[in-house]
């Protein structure tokens, strides 16, 4: 048999001599190996391989796979790795469009020929001594997009699924001494039409490669089921085993032992046969869930007639029952709510080559932020993910390697008819797709974490996908099947067991469920977290507890798919689509993570953690109603600490014993009386881990709630020297003890504020109506719709018209009865129709300056992004201390997770690391903020409850940069004090607008007052 490269465009050519898919358990040669976790039956081939890069199939070196071909002149390459990350070609980011679109006219199933890189690998090895006289196989855990394999010049086989193992038997071709393993990996093959996922397009051997040997009596496959009775009390562990038995081995036995922390729970033994079926009754097992991921240990031991161990196979077992009950999804008898996230298998330094420690970091971050579910968008992940999800407690939607968005998008746009869909009704593609279903199922079937199988993503509908769903059901009666595409194509509506949609607003979900009550509803993608986003997420999360049929969703998505690199000056930066010269591309649309590319949490995570927490409370002065949204865990499992603060300063704390059963609520008296001393009080309930867990240490906060009340304070009366007003020809000065304020007639505004002899202002404060557009703004054309407000922010002036110039030529300083002095300016906003704003400064003898901005609505002028003031201070004033909502940035539609308190930050730290610079760093409900230098000198800003930000850049500088390295050098600190900024939105990033309730109402007069004073 020979490899026929011409078949790469044949959808029926997806496996040749490939080993049948099987479970991902690990086998050990004896119990001693098992005890130390090192198996002699496996030998890694990771490391350096010889490598040749061809731009297309025609440039592949003929005969490179021959045993006598000399590859010493080839380069070395690391395995596992994407070749594009090793300097061969470049990553290409594309969302919907196929990566070859526009370069070559390629029909469905065909592949590009002019540019379709081929990676040729050679690895020499000696068969490890412990594998001698055994059957030997090679496993490629991930080869993108397909792989052909040779050993010592003999063609071994072919496989064409990038994301499930490609395994081949090598036994017949092994020789004594050095063996030569050669393989050829095409960047694109027929299967690539099914791999149009929204990710960085790369290729190569990107997961582990290893040899494994099997003993003469071998557990080739294992399928376990945990069958709970209808009371969810007792269980049967149902085991189906397939064995590979060499005729020479003689009589063998297999023992089954289920243990719990070393204690034997159940056992059985039987004669080894090709197929075995064993059931182990288990009384009252501890059940597995995200809240309590309890795992038992199953050990299968194969022994020969003399009792000698031939093989030992361990398997973790989580007892759980997932089912459709009363029209809803239930786990262990309880209605489940998915608090999930979509996760691409991605590492900023190596692409889809994800080290286990990076994977663990991701999952620990999820657990710490109350995420309970993962959707493996949109392909099977490495086996390590499922083992860790079993251990840590994360529910999984395991998704088949299928996305053909680039084909059905043309149907949606009306360019093609329905028959163009892939796989659609093209039954010639069915064998490949059913094979992908089977490969994923067989590998992953024993993981307790997997509750739902998914047929794939964004591939429209049709007969083929329906058959995929049917195959899942035939293979597994313990899980449900998911497919979102039925929303677009209802021909096979029962392809999915649940209604699944993407980015439908809550009002749309309500409407759908009002008319369709036959099955539950989930959002497999929602809250598109591109850039500064996740606004109004709570609308979705709260709805899950209002509508039983709505059972949660999965945020899009977990991590920015950005690649760590250097700018031209050697500074670290994170690159996105188009930065590699890749075209076509979709630029920064890969930056949708609630964590940055390096795994650091973005400010959005603050809201995600809060919206997903299982304990909520409503606090009123001296009592709290605590609601427990957990399925199985009493609130008594956590320490609850009540914290009392006055004006942001903690004055008392005390434990509060709670005992709220799952899905119930109870009222508790707080350990503090209502305070009588004047001030603003916060009562915070903090729920914390009582003991260390695998994902966080004792004392870690898993949930909090906060109540606020105020007690009237008596006004303070302090005496200061009277103000001295100097009315010059071109300036008006207002002077007091230790400070001086100057208003300029020529420049039309506050030109100077000196405190203690130091000038505090870098420029004249200005009315501001603009923010740097966030990604959601750009997707909804906000810059175009609101452009007049950008112009107003840049060019509003007191001399915008001759009439205004006359009115503002000699502003009058009015001396008020309380000893203060006021001066007023009228700004023309340069809008069409004309708009005006009135800015009034009032200087008090203490040195405080009140700033009031007034705006009267103008018919024909639309919503404004922001209403407030902008001023600059020297960059030395970069230390921020404030009393408001924090600690991370927050907005009117993303304040969940922020708490009222006193926080510290810096202007530079306030710049969030979104891939494209945009609005960031805002804080809501700010009572006061101090902007100082390192010696504590600066300005204190105050208001009742303003929005506030302090950044090193203006909104326009942020807007003008497409990368962080395009931002200018830091010269000042930009203060923006606002009545309000519009919300950031987040329903999607390509058209959805900020919800009306989170916009600034410009149909009514707007007035905003804040003050500043030197410190």
Segments and roles (model prediction):
Residues 85, 94, 142, 187, ...:
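Beta-strand/loop-rich accessory regions of lumenal/periplasmic or secreted enzymes
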Residues 1-37, 96, 193, 309-621, ...:
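Extended substrate-binding grooves/exosites of carbohydrate-active enzymes
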Residues 268-284, 648-678, 687:
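Intrinsically disordered, low-complexity Pro/Gly/Ser/Thr-rich segments with frequent PxxP/GP/PP motifs
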Residues 1-19, 27, 35-36, 50-54, ...:
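Accessory beta-strand-rich segments of carbohydrate-active enzymes
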Residues 195-219, 570-619, 629-649, 662, ...:
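Catalytic cores of secreted or luminal carbohydrate-active enzymes
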Residues 85, 90, 95-111, 160-162, ...:
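An acidic-aromatic loop/edge-strand motif
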């Amino acid at each position: 048999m020979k490899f026929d490269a011409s078949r790469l465009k044949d959808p029926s050519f997806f496996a040749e001599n490939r080993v049948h898919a099987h479970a991902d358990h690990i086998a050990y040669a004896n119990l001693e190996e098992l005890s130390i976790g090192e198996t002699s039956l496996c030998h890694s081939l990771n490391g350096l391989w010889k490598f040749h890069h061809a731009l297309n199939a025609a440039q592949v070196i003929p005969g490179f796979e021959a045993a006598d071909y000399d590859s010493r002149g080839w380069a070395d390459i690391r395995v596992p790795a994407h070749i594009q990350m090793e300097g061969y070609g470049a990553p290409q980011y594309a969302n919907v469009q196929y990566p070859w679109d526009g370069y070559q006219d390629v029909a469905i199933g065909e592949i590009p020929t002019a540019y379709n890189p081929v990676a040729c690998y050679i690895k020499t090895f000696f068969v490890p001594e412990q594998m001698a006289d055994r059957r030997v196989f090679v496993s490629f855990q991930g080869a993108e997009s397909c792989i052909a394999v040779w050993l010592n010049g003999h063609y071994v086989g072919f496989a064409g699924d990038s994301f499930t193992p490609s395994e081949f038997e090598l036994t017949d071709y092994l020789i004594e001494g050095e063996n030569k393993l050669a393989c050829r990996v095409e960047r694109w093959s027929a299967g690539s039409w099914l791999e149009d996922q929204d990710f960085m397009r790369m290729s190569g051997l990107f997961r582990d490669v290893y040899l494994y040997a099997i003993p003469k009596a071998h557990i080739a496959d294992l399928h376990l089921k945990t069958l709970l009775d209808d009371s969810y009390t007792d269980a049967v562990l149902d085991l189906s085993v397939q064995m590979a038995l060499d005729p020479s081995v003689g009589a063998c036995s297999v023992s089954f032992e289920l243990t719990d922390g070393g204690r034997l729970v159940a056992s059985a033994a039987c004669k080894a046969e090709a197929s075995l079926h064993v059931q182990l009754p288990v009384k009252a097992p501890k059940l597995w869930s995200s809240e309590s991921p309890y795992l038992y240990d199953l050990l299968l031991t194969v022994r020969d007639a003399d009792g000698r161990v031939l093989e030992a196979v361990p398997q973790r077992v989580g007892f759980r029952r997932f089912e459709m009950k009363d029209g809803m999804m239930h786990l262990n008898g309880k209605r489940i709510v998915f608090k999930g996230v979509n996760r691409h298998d991605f590492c900023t330094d190596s692409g889809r080559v994800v080290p286990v420690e990076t994977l663990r970091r991701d999952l620990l971050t999820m657990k710490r932020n109350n995420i309970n579910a993962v959707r493996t968008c949109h392909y099977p992940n490495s086996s390590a993910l499922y083992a860790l999800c079993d251990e840590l407690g994360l529910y999984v939607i395991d998704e088949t390697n299928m996305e053909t968005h680039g084909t059905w998008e043309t149907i949606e746009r009306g360019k093609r008819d329905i028959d163009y869909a892939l796989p659609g009704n093209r039954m010639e593609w069915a064998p490949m797709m059913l094979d992908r279903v089977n490969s994923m199922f067989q590998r992953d079937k024993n993981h307790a974490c997997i509750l739902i199988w998914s047929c794939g993503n964004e591939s429209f509908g049709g007969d083929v996908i329906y058959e995929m769903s049917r195959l899942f059901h035939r293979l597994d009666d313990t899980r449900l099947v998911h497919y979102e595409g039925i929303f677009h194509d209802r021909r096979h509506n029962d392809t999915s067991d649940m209604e699944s949609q993407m980015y439908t607003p809550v009002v749309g979900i309500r409407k759908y469920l009002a008319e369709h009550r036959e099955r539950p509803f989930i959002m497999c993608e929602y809250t598109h977290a591109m850039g500064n986003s996740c606004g109004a997420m709570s609308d979705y999360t709260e709805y899950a507890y209002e509508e039983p049929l709505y059972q949660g969703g999965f945020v899009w998505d977990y991590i920015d798919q950005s690649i760590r690199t250097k700018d031209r000056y050697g500074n670290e930066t994170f690159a996105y689509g188009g930065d590699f010269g890749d075209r076509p591309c979709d630029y920064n649309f890969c930056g949708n993570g609630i964590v940055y590319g390096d795994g650091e949490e973005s400010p959005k995570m603050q809201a995600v953690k809060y919206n997903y927490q299982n304990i909520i409370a409503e606090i009123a002065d001296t009592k709290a109603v605590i609601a427990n949204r957990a399925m199985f865990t009493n609130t008594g499992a956590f320490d609850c600490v009540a914290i009392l603060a006055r004006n942001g300063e903690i004055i008392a704390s005390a434990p509060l014993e709670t005992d709220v059963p799952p899905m119930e609520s109870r009222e508790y008296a707080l350990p503090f009386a209502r305070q009588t001393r004047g001030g603003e009080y916060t009562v915070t309930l903090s729920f914390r881990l009582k003991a260390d867990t695998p994902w966080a240490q004792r004392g870690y906060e898993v949930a909090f709630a906060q109540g606020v009340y105020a007690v009237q304070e008596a006004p303070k009366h302090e005496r200061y020297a009277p103000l001295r007003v100097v009315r010059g020809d071109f300036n008006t000065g207002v002077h007091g003890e230790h400070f001086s304020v100057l208003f300029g007639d020529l420049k039309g505004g506050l030109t100077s504020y000196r405190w203690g002899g130091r000038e505090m202002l870098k420029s004249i404060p200005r009315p501001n109506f603009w923010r740097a557009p966030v990604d959601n703004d750009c997707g909804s054309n906000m810059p175009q719709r609101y452009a007049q407000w950008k112009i107003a922010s840049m060019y509003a002036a007191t001399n915008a018209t001759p009439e205004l110039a006359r009115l503002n030529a000699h502003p009058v300083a009015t001396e008020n009865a309380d000893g203060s002095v006021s001066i007023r300016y009228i700004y023309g906003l340069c809008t069409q129709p004309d708009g005006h704003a009135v800015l009034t400064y009032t200087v008090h003898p203490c040195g405080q300056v009140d700033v009031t901005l007034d705006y009267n609505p103008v018919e024909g002028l639309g919503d404004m992004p922001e209403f407030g003031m902008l001023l600059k201070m020297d960059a030395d004033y970069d230390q921020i201390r404030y009393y408001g909502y924090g600690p991370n940035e927050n907005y009117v539609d993303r304040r969940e997770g922020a708490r009222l308190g006193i926080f510290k930050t810096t202007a530079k730290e306030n710049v969030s690391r979104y891939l494209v610079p945009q609005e960031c760093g805002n804080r809501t409900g700010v009572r006061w903020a101090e902007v100082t230098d390192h010696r504590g000198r600066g300005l204190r800003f105050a208001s009742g409850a303003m929005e506030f930000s302090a950044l090193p850049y203006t909104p326009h500088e942020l807007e003008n940069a497409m990368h962080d390295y395009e931002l200018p050098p830091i010269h000042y600190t930009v203060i923006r004090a606002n009545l309000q900024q519009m919300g950031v939105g987040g329903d999607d990033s390509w058209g959805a607008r900020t919800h009306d309730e989170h916009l600034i109402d410009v149909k009514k007069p707007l007035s905003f007052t804040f003050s500043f004073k030197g410190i």
